[in-house]
Curated annotation (Swiss-Prot):
Similarity remark: Belongs to the glycoside hydrolase-like 3 (GHL3) family.
Protein name (database record): Putative glycoside hydrolase 22789
Biased composition (Low complexity): 173-187
EC identifiers of the protein: 3.2.1.-
Positions of the UniProt region annotated as Disordered: 173-221
UniProt superkingdom: Eukaryota
Record-linked InterPro entries: DUF6259
Alphabetic keyword roster: Glycosidase, Hydrolase
Record-level Gene Ontology MF annotations: hydrolase activity, acting on glycosyl bonds
Record bears the keyword Hydrolase: yes
Length: 1191
């Protein structure tokens, strides 16, 4: 029988049905059937490409067809009954009507008047299954008889609560307290009278149904039905095991119609679910919750599943325990009577015993049998073996080398048997203890295995090993790691942090395919006055080939004074050898070697992204751990990483929404993702590509598109190469002339002429305030958010327009985050109402106070709530005036992406309290408010490159990104442009006056900006250069006179050269993305700055290099850039397949290019072995080589 035809033939003629009596989920089921069987399976979450001979076995596909055939029968019957009632049809009280409806009952595949068998059903090939399953009276029991107050509701009459395992299979109370809706005797077929004593009579007065046998509940009556008779026939001891049977089937893990969960104590563990996951998946896919389904319909589903799991349940449930008195278990018989020569024979024997066809077993069933086989074999050989048998098997295609064994194997294990295990079992991975013959003590370790990562947990849920596909022999963990997840609770008594797994063993469940698992602690708060449960799920992400951890905390006593504060995943004991490294996402990214400690609040300059990595080195065969929060909405969180003596730890802390407030349930709204990645010295790059896959696919901030797709990134802005600022000092030390319009006009004109290129001016100290007296001027970091009018009044606008005519684009400074408590606006607009309040961990988060900040100016600030409408409007007013009144082309709004969020617990603020993603949405709304005033084409930029603001912010001042050294044990790596290249604009670094006196460090900073794709400069023109106010920690910033000196001619020419080269390579450096770096031989020499009163004193490399991919991914450029004015020669080696695996086995064309349009072809080379010899650099120049990938 063709399954497609079977499903299609069951659809009947539905066009005349009245579907008004069906609920939403039921109408979806019928409508999907009308579209055809494959459309229906798509609704079921199976997918449109399901075929019996591909990813589903024929047996599983028939199960789906039969289940949905039964569903359709039920729904059609309900709709037709509704149609009859609406046509004033007589009550269904005669045999003919009953027979008519009986023909529609769910399991009647043939003549309704005859007993139904499953002989024609290819699924019913288990022993003894050719027996009557359902009689018409049972169908009427499902549908209602039309004579009770509930009958008009049909299948929807019963209480839509969850199934009660202690009730009968179809029993359960109604919403009015009545028993299940059962037909009256007159609704039976002619032999119904013999069954009359089993049926309740309606009591119109009470609306309840009475029982005709004293005190016997409705579920006992059902044992006299044909269904119960079938169960008795199949299982003579059914009365004694019914409750256990029903309970077990509710716990069964159901995959495509085949049971593959094994009971606790044998080869797996159980999970508690009110309905089979098949039903959950079925209706979750169409957006319908199970409680909205008719309870009888759900129960019919589950009853059908129960019956077809029966034979499998006999096989799996408790069959590996010790023999019980009076009967021998399957496991005992296997050990005593059978010698299993190979896994194949074992599987064949099991299939023959239960009439299962080996070739049609689902993958999950094969894996389950493999696990059972190993248990049996292990018990038979345990007395002769010691240690632990560890079996690591690759994916179903066996793409990796068959490196299977680790540890001690049973002596009789044969090589051909192991190869059979690979073939039959596919991608499974598990450990079995072989040091005991006590089968009840066998505790299978939970092991999740993908083609890239194998993660092993012991019986307590502790991480015991973490290894990658490159070598199963390498364990990235130095020790077993327990207490890797913690929950921080607050009560009236104080704060408690519970770390798990600990001595409290969880209940656990492994999925059928062996790649997902769940740990549950019903109560983690022993010894406390609260009752809190925790569930952790690790699920395999197929796209990323990684594991995603999800957490759910339940408060079983919501009225108790207890609340949740934060959740933390802390992976300790990560092996980081001396030659290994770690990555932390500050700025563009920092690579650490050796001991270190780093932390950052996300989103901020200290944690611009949400991922870390650690490991690498020869001992790890280049592999490391990737840990990330794959959160596409930007929830507030905290990242921490450290390493001591070759052991690293990585942790992510999630501040929960409404932290400290009463709660019933809290689910982490994003997964924490962990995986093993390769990469060796460039471990950071491979980890970055995994994060890039997530970000491009799920992150909200990617929706604005690439640079050329955005209106707020005009062409002149992308093409800009050099930035200057009017004068800035890191400790707010300014002289009087730095922001004066007359001074700014004069010095900017001359610098523009000196560099002979367009540039952007970041203008500080432009504000005056309402008092025109110089002594009353609003100085830097005072009076925020009050700025206007500007210094010089209308003359400020005149200077702006004059400079813009000469090719200088003006970006005045404002602050978007802090509120001066001494400002006029704070006093006039109840400033405290618009500011954030912090809370110490406490129940109710009642202990609140303002965040207080102060900088070099001495003013006191509170942090404004970015979601506050007043704050958004006030900032938009200022930007409106600057653009539309004074003519600036862009505005710099400080701190938005640099400063850490200040979680807010103010009760009347319109966002979640404490945790949440409101910080991102608030800042995005600030920018939206500004754009409503100035239009979409004005660049609005801020400090630092925090990812979640990319869709709103036009560019980022990258001071923090370029703060680390470029080589050494704490070095900048361009992870951010490796992920987001082509989607953002970065500009700027801190340059000191000392850098111009010692020109090589300045040139190193400029070259770093160039090779990493940023716009150059941010040279500070004004500043205090002498006297007691000179900044001795950050260095002198006033550089104008030095730039204009003849002694700087060479360095000016070099900066101009790299600025022009950047414009020439914009299609790569701005619109493309950076790849893994090339290798230079010999390694460039390193040097330190002569002057040390600067933030980055080195070490600096004498040359830097990079590979950039074009946006169309058809070519790349290899850049080698000189820092020193002395000659240097290098050989360059590039393996493009490391970054672009699609180029494997490809030949590429390499040519040296120049910006004058001339190029010289070098050779055709393998993409994985590009060699360019004798690359000579002189006079701080660069060599550029274009690589064409070809067809």
């Amino acid at each position: 029988m063709d399954p497609n035809n079977a499903a299609a033939s069951s659809a009947h003629d539905l066009s005349s049905l009245d579907l008004s009596c069906l609920n939403e989920a039921e109408r979806i089921v019928i409508n999907s059937f009308m579209r055809g069987p494959h459309a229906h399976f798509e609704h079921l979450g199976v997918g449109p490409n399901v075929k019996w001979d591909e990813n589903l076995s024929k047996r599983a596909f028939y199960h789906l067809v039969a289940i949905n055939h039964a569903t359709l029968k039920l729904l059609v019957a309900q709709a037709r009954l509704c149609s009859m009632q609406q046509m004033n049809a007589p009550n269904l009280t005669n045999g003919a009507s009953a027979t008519a409806l009986g023909s529609l009952h769910p399991f009647s595949l043939g003549n309704p008047a005859t007993s139904v068998t499953m002989a024609s059903n290819p699924l019913a090939n288990g022993p003894g299954l050719r027996t009557q399953l359902m009689a018409p009276d049972f169908a009427l029991a499902l549908l209602g008889n039309g004579t009770t107050p509930h009958a008009s509701a049909g299948l929807g009459a019963l209480n839509p609560g969850l199934y009660n395992p202690s009730a009968s299979i179809l029993g359960g109370p109604s919403s009015s307290g009545a028993s299940s809706v059962l037909p009256s005797p007159s609704a039976h077929t002619p032999d119904a009278a013999t069954d009359a004593n089993h049926l309740p009579n309606p009591d119109p007065a009470s609306g309840r149904q009475e029982l005709t046998r004293a005190g016997r509940p409705a579920r006992k009556k059902m044992k006299a039905t044909a269904l119960d008779a079938a169960l008795r026939t199949e299982m003579p001891n059914w009365p004694s095991v019914q409750d256990d049977f029903v309970r077990w089937t509710r716990l069964a893990w159901f995959e495509a119609g085949f049971a593959s969960t094994i009971s606790d104590g044998a080869i797996g563990v159980q999970t508690r679910r009110p309905f089979s996951p098949f039903l959950t998946t079925t209706f979750a896919q169409v957006g319908v919750h199970l409680p909205s389904m008719s309870p009888n319909l759900l129960r019919a589903f589950n009853s059908w599943v129960d019956m077809h799991l029966r034979s499998l349940r006999d096989h799996f449930k408790g069959r590996i325990d010790k023999p019980h008195a009076g009967k021998a278990s399957l496991a005992a018989r296997s050990l005593e009577d059978t010698t299993f020569v190979s896994l194949t024979e074992f599987i064949n024997n099991m299939c023959n015993s239960y009439n299962l066809i080996n070739s049609e077993l689902s993958v999950a069933a094969v894996r389950a049998l493999c696990k059972l086989y190993l248990n049996v074999r292990n018990m038979a050989t345990a007395k002769d073996s010691e240690g632990v048998l560890r079996v690591h098997i690759r994916d179903a295609s066996n793409r990796q080398p068959p490196n299977i064994l680790r540890g001690t194997l049973p002596q009789d294990r044969e090589d051909d048997d192991l190869l059979t295990l690979i073939t039959e079992c596919g991608a499974i991975d598990f450990d079995l203890p072989t040091d005991t013959s006590d089968t009840m003590a066998l505790a299978v370790l939970m092991v999740m295995s993908t083609s890239a990562t194998t993660l092993t947990l012991d019986q307590a849920g502790c991480f015991s090993s973490l290894s990658g596909a490159a070598s199963a022999q390498v364990n990235l963990l130095t020790n077993v790691t327990c207490e890797w997840f913690s929950v921080t609770m607050v009560t009236e008594s104080g704060t408690s942090t519970i770390s798990l797994p600990s001595s409290t063993r969880p209940s656990a469940h492994i999925s059928a395919h062996g790649k997902d698992f769940a740990l549950s602690w019903p109560k983690i708060t022993e010894g406390l006055e609260i009752d809190i449960g925790l569930t952790l799920e690790l699920q395999h992400n197929v796209t990323l080939d990684a594991y995603e951890l999800r957490a759910k905390v339940v408060n079983h006593r919501p009225k108790a004074k207890a609340s949740l504060w934060q959740l933390e995943l802390n992976l300790r004991n990560v092996r980081q050898p001396e030659d290994g490294s770690a990555f932390f996402p500050a700025g563009y990214g920092v690579r650490y070697q050796g001991a270190f400690a780093a932390s950052g609040s996300y989103p901020s300059s200290g944690a611009t992204m949400q991922w870390m990595a650690a490991g690498g080195g020869a001992a790890n065969e280049g592999q490391g751990l990737y840990l990330a929060a794959h959160d596409g909405y930007g929830y507030i969180k905290f990242l921490n990483a450290a390493a001591v003596e070759d052991v690293a730890s990585l942790s992510i802390v999630y501040l929960v929404e409404d932290a400290g407030l009463p709660f019933a349930e809290s689910t982490m709204p994003f997964p924490l993702t962990l995986a093993v990645v390769g990469g060796g010295d460039d471990l950071w790059y491979q980890a970055a590509q995994m994060y890039r896959t997530f970000a491009l696919g799920e992150a909200q901030w990617m929706q604005a598109g690439r640079l050329h797709q955005r209106q707020d990134i005009p062409g002149w802005y992308v093409n800009n190469s050099i930035w200057i600022n009017s004068g800035w000092q890191c400790h707010d030390i300014f002289n009087e002339t730095q922001g004066d319009p007359h001074t700014v006009l004069n010095v900017t004109r001359r610098i523009r002429e000196r560099f002979n290129t367009n540039m952007a001016l970041h203008w500080y100290e432009w504000q005056q305030g309402p008092d025109a007296n110089a002594s009353a001027r609003y100085r830097f970091d005072t009076h925020y958010p009050d700025y206007l009018p500007p210094r010089g009044g209308d003359y400020f606008g005149t200077v702006v327009r004059e400079l813009e005519k000469e090719g200088v684009h003006i970006f005045p400074y404002i602050n978007g985050r802090i509120f001066d408590v001494a400002s006029t606006s704070y006093a006039q607009h109840n400033g405290s109402d618009h500011c954030c309040r912090k809370a110490n961990p406490s129940f109710g988060a009642a202990d609140q106070s303002f965040y207080v900040e102060s900088y070099g100016s001495g003013s006191t600030f509170h942090t404004a709530d970015p979601t506050d409408i007043y704050w958004q409007t006030t900032l938009a007013d200022t930007v409106d005036a600057l653009v539309n009144t004074y003519g600036v082309e862009g505005v710099y709004i400080d701190q938005l992406a640099a400063a850490a969020p200040t979680p807010d617990w103010t009760s009347w603020h319109n966002h979640t309290k404490g945790g949440g993603f409101y910080w991102r949405t608030g800042i995005v709304d600030i920018i939206k408010a500004m754009r409503q005033r100035v239009g979409p084409t004005v660049p609005l930029v801020t400090e630092s490159n925090s990812e979640p603001y990319m869709d709103a912010i036009s560019g980022f001042l990258t001071l923090v990104a370029f703060e680390p050294a470029f080589v050494g044990t704490k070095a900048l790596v361009p992870a951010f442009p490796a992920i987001y290249g082509g989607y953002f604009v970065g500009f700027g670094d801190i340059f000191n006056a000392e850098d111009l006196a010692d020109q090589d460090p300045l040139m190193a900073r400029v070259v770093a900006q160039f090779v990493y794709g940023a716009q150059l400069g941010w040279f500070s023109l004004g500043g205090v250069t002498s006297g007691p106010d000179v900044d001795t920690s950050c260095g002198k910033m006033g550089e104008y006179d030095l730039w204009m000196s003849e002694s700087s001619d060479a360095i000016v020419a070099a900066v101009e050269y790299y600025g022009n080269l950047r414009v020439c390579l914009l299609e790569y450096l701005a619109h493309g993305r950076i790849l893994a770096p090339p290798s230079l031989s010999p390694a460039p020499a390193e040097f330190m700055a002569v002057e040390t009163a600067v933030q980055n004193a080195g070490p600096f490399p004498s040359a830097m290099s990079a590979v950039w991919l074009h946006e169309d991914e058809a070519s790349a450029v290899i850049i080698v850039a000189g820092v020193l004015d002395a000659g240097q020669t290098y050989n360059v080696s590039v393996d493009l397949t490391f970054s672009l695996p699609s180029l494997h086995d490809r030949q590429v064309t390499v040519q040296e290019m120049s910006c004058d349009g001339l190029s010289q072809q070098l050779d055709v080379m393998p993409a994985n072995d590009i060699q360019i010899y004798d690359v000579t650099l002189s006079d701080r120049n660069a060599r550029v080589y274009r690589v064409h990938f070809g067809a």
